[in-house]
Amino acid sequence: MAAGRVWGRLGAVSGALAVTAGAYGAHGFRRSDRDEYLKELFETGNRYHFLHSLALLAVPHCRRPLLAGSLLTSGIVLFSGTFYYQALSGDPTLTKAAPYGGTLLILGWAAMAL
């Protein structure tokens, strides 16, 4: 399998996971007794997860797919993963990783422009 195709497939799997998480957020998590802040965190993490999964689908068309794909994937894990974790557990200890994840997402978009 060509290296570029891996990123397209990863984007598709990530998108499927984002839709699954969104369904849980809309039907399970939102109906729970969690406070509004945690619900907003979950929604934000899910929104960024989904949008950047779509970006991964374009990575095979970049000049540097390994760089762009690695940055976007790492950014999704650190940014959205941190928000998902805090929203589900209530534990804010990993929150400090979110800005690093956001920075990786920005760099991933920039790498797509190279």
Curated annotation (Swiss-Prot):
Residues 86-93 are cytoplasmic. Keywords: Cell membrane, Membrane, Signal, Transmembrane, Transmembrane helix. It is found in: Cell membrane. Pfam families: DUF423. It comes from the Eukaryota. The chain crosses the membrane at residues 65-85, 94-114. Residues 1-25 form the signal peptide. One of its GO terms (cellular component) is plasma membrane. It is a multi-pass membrane protein. Its main location: membrane. Residues 26-64 are extracellular. InterPro entries: DUF423. Belongs to the TMEM256 family. This is Transmembrane protein 256 homolog. It comes from Bufo gargarizans. The lineage of its organism: Eukaryota, Metazoa, Chordata, Craniata, Vertebrata.
